[in-house]
Amino acid sequence: IALNLVKRGITDSTMFDLSKNVLQPTTALYKKNILLTRGRFRPVTKVHIDMIENGRKAFMEENDVKEEDVSVVFELTLKDLTADGKILVQDFLDRADLLSSLGYTVMVSNYLKHYKMVEYLAPIARGKLIGVILGVYNLNTIFEEKYYGNLPGGLLEAFGRGFGHHMKIYVYPAFNVEDGEIYDLNNIEIAPNLVGLLNYMRDNDKIKEIKEFNPKLLHIMSDDVLSKIKAGASSWEEDVPESVGKAIKFYELFGYQKKEIKV
């Protein structure tokens, strides 16, 4: 029901806690320091957990951020729940259940673009810090001007509307398959005319790199894990948390099929 409310545009977002209770973001996140990570999580992998745990450590280092006032949220957008224009309700519920089983709150929203989500959360947070954890390749997308063609002021308008609030982006590195090196905030490749903007944001404490991470996990990609599951390979189990692996096998999620035991 809650998902349908978002789907029909009656509400812009809804949340589920670890007990699968439906929450109203305006109440659950009121005056909270909010740490948000966005993605498909199909399925949630070890690298996702490393990202959120080390992103949280960086978030907790900020001034005036206290443990009791922090809400960690995994967000799924409606676009990430569609296939051929149709909402995959069961697929969403499966992903929400997996994240909830790990102890995280799940949000589903209509906000595809990051600045729109920050605009939505800012009045709820009431001056508290909003942290957004992004993989470095997603940060590349934020710095693509074509992403903001619908705004009269383009990229600068979006950045003003998003970063003008009390918010910060925490950037998680990636493995560069082309050269085998770690790709991070220090060697990110963006358009030359936007390098100054990136430096401005770094100088004004709007972007921070996540320095603690497990480099052995950076090769894990959700799409690759999903392909392994569907292909019947067993190596995917090494890429997900143990509880997630057990749930995928028990409930036969994401195309997993139990192997028949021959007698």
Regions found by a protein language model. Give the residues of each.
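Nucleotidyltransferase catalytic core that binds NTPs
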Residues: I1-V263
